[in-house]
Amino acid sequence: APALGFVPIAVHFDLFGCLQEIGKPATAQDVCISITFLHKKSMFAKVNRSSDDTLFLMGGLGFLDLLPDDVYQANAVTRFLVDTPSAQHGAMHFTSEGLLASAFLMRRLMDTKFEYPFQECDTPFQYAHKLMGNEHLAREHVYSVMHETGRLDSFNTFMTGKFGRWGTMPDRVRKLGYDLDGLLQSTAPERIRVVDIGGGRGELLLEMQATYPHLLKKENLILQEYNADIGVVPEVTEMGWNYKEDASEQPVKGALLYSMAHVLHNLSDIESIKLLTKVARVMAPSSRLLIQEFTKNAASSTTHAAMILMHAGRERTSAEWRDLAAFAGLEITFEAYPPNGECVVEM
């Protein structure tokens, strides 16, 4: 675990990219020189002092190959990290915010006489900031903390890749037996509205638009995000909605499809029910709510732990989804749980 603390250094200085750019076995000095050419010369002195240890530890983690005489070489994992920037930023997130929360888990449990489960904004992540004297950050949500500490843009880059592992969203749900084609094609084009709640930079909507260009135009695709660093997504209709505010109701009524992908696992059961209830109140009889999260099993156990430690959230089983649906006045009409990747739950 201590070696994981060096991952943010490797990502910050682009050590993986520089090693791959060299294209042959290289010393830490070679990598540092490469950084001065690929980035800026002022970085050389900063990275030179820690590069050898960082490269060695990344080799120990399997992210690159360790060769004799303190020589390093890119391997398949290195190439994956370079070719998939979201993976590097994901690694940075889990070894920054995630590792911080993990380090303070037992301390918080002991200090609170093992109070569990955690509640939103009262997790080991906030407790870490409290004990470090950051009283303001200790009261903030992890996203607000990342915004204030300059980490949110990196996190958004990580989330850009959350849909890119096993094909596009339409391909993935088709393979699981969900009839997205039938749902869209059986509806008059002027009545089609797809609302992606917490949709980041709009990747899911853009994948749907690319698959159904004859059906989905900008006015059909509504991106709802409450995130200060998202920026403009010109191909979709952007709309702010802070569902956390008690008086803030879902502004789009009667949409054909409401989507939540990797949103509810960030929320406790109580907060999830609040959000689901707000959507349920505006759904028409023909409306569908489509949820995509990781299937809760051994493969997603690390993500499950991260959600608990930072968000008081969790991955969920079929029985847990059914309980949430019932509390929100909804009914599950389709569900599929692959052994790897994202499950699909329709309400």
UniProtKB/Swiss-Prot annotation:
- Which residues bind S-adenosyl-L-methionine per the record? W166
Alphabetical list of Pfam families matching this protein: Methyltransf_2
What is the uppermost EC class here? transferase
Q: Which GO terms describe its biological process?
A: methylation; secondary metabolite biosynthetic process
Identify the species of origin: Aspergillus niger (strain ATCC 1015 / CBS 113.46 / FGSC A1144 / LSHB Ac4 / NCTC 3858a / NRRL 328 / USDA 3528.7)
Annotated protein name in UniProt: O-methyltransferase aunE
Give its E.C. classification number: 2.1.1.-
- Which UniProt keywords are given for this protein, alphabetically ordered? Methyltransferase, S-adenosyl-L-methionine, Transferase
UniProt lineage: Eukaryota, Fungi, Dikarya, Ascomycota, Pezizomycotina
Transmembrane spans = none
The active site annotation covers H265
Where does the signal peptide begin and end?
A: none
Pathway, per Swiss-Prot/TrEMBL?
A: Secondary metabolite biosynthesis
- Tell me the protein family, please: Belongs to the class I-like SAM-binding methyltransferase superfamily. Cation-independent O-methyltransferase family.
Please provide, alphabetically and separated by semicolons, the GO molecular function terms listed in this UniProt record. Answer: O-methyltransferase activity
Annotated coiled-coil positions are none
